[in-house]
Amino acid sequence: MPKVGIAAQAGRTRVRRAWLTALMMTAVMIGAVACGSGRGPAPIKVIADKGTPFADLLVPKLTASVTDGAVGVTVDAPVSVTAADGVLAAVTMVNDNGRPVAGRLSPDGLRWSTTEQLGYNRRYTLNATALGLGGAATRQLTFQTSSPAHLTMPYVMPGDGEVVGVGEPVAIRFDENIADRGAAEKAIKITTNPPVEGAFYWLNNREVRWRPEHFWKPGTAVDVAVNTYGVDLGEGMFGEDNVQTHFTIGDEVIATADDNTKILTVRVNGEVVKSMPTSMGKDSTPTANGIYIVGSRYKHIIMDSSTYGVPVNSPNGYRTDVDWATQISYSGVFVHSAPWSVGAQGHTNTSHGCLNVSPSNAQWFYDHVKRGDIVEVVNTVGGTLPGIDGLGDWNIPWDQWRAGNAKA
């Protein structure tokens, strides 16, 4: 057993011994004054058989965070019981199946609190006993937890243990629309080492992002705790569970695609490690400028324009088998192998918006980038990748991002 636990247990033992010693000494003194005989100390009084008025003042008092018969008790906070003018001698709590609920007694013996989540729509019974100089107090109460009409589950990216790029935001996606965005944000705790200032921004009614003002520093450790269980998220929607994740920021990998040169240049920690010719979107379907975040990677994928609203049989439609595809936008932009356009790469833009590269370069890119790395596209005739694309977060100005849109 850890030394800390032993010390805490020893502390509680000393507190109880002190109270019990005081109880015995008081009982002896009261017996000696009242009887003046040698028959030994009088028995400790209990509430039902109180002795002197002085003892009435020292009867322990029990206070609970819930009331007997309560219905709709929230489950986002511990249930607790506290003793005054005495110490807790025994506390038990069980659910409607008789299963004990875990709890912890404070070192001073004055407070007991649950340490596990309570279930929705469950009935619980709490029994507590306290000892004081004036006797013992007991209390039993039964209550029922809330029964939400709707539940929503949060999902967090990056995954636990991942090493990601300097541009990776924290992403929390719910499986239902969130009416009270502010309540959701308050339930999310993000801790970084070293400390970094960041802010929330909602891409839509279900997904909120958190990022710093500038790209992460390599080596930064990030812990995310989404504590939405039991939290009212508006319009009868409550959190279904809590979720935690820990991830680390890896090397800085930034690729720049310049339409003036039609070259994709990859830098790792500021040093150029690879340059490759590319063919980007033709004038009728130009590649948008801006900062893209690397998402998923596929050794093989079927690209279908209908997945982002362009029918396959339309002039700009397509359905094509593609190898070594690295996603950089939710709107369908990839860095991928395009053997059919090798002759145009470095000279002419021929694609529907993707960054076409040779098969060997596409495989190299696939092998050397990771989720959260950055691709910046510059000098095209296109507009700017929308910040709410899903992988375009860094295109939203920091002042706008920091101001947030929880009330939108």
UniProtKB/Swiss-Prot annotation:
SUPFAM superfamilies: L,D-transpeptidase catalytic domain-like (SSF141523). It is found in: Cell membrane. Transmembrane segments: none annotated. Pathway: Cell wall biogenesis; peptidoglycan biosynthesis. Substrate binds at residues 318, 331-332, 356. Changing residue 318 to A/F: Decreases stability of the covalent enzyme-meropenem adduct. GO terms for biological process: cell wall organization; peptidoglycan-protein cross-linking; regulation of cell shape. It comes from Mycobacterium tuberculosis (strain ATCC 25618 / H37Rv). It comes from the Bacteria. Ca(2+) binds at residues 232, 235-236. Generates 3->3 cross-links in peptidoglycan, catalyzing the cleavage of the mDap(3)-D-Ala(4) bond of a tetrapeptide donor stem and the formation of a bond between the carbonyl of mDap(3) of the donor stem and the side chain of mDap(3) of the acceptor stem. Is specific for donor substrates containing a stem tetrapeptide since it cannot use pentapeptide stems. InterPro entries: Big_10 (IPR041280), LD-transpeptidase (IPR050979), LD_TPept_cat_dom (IPR005490), Transpep_catalytic_dom (IPR038063). This is L,D-transpeptidase 2. The active site is at 336 (proton donor/acceptor), 354 (nucleophile).
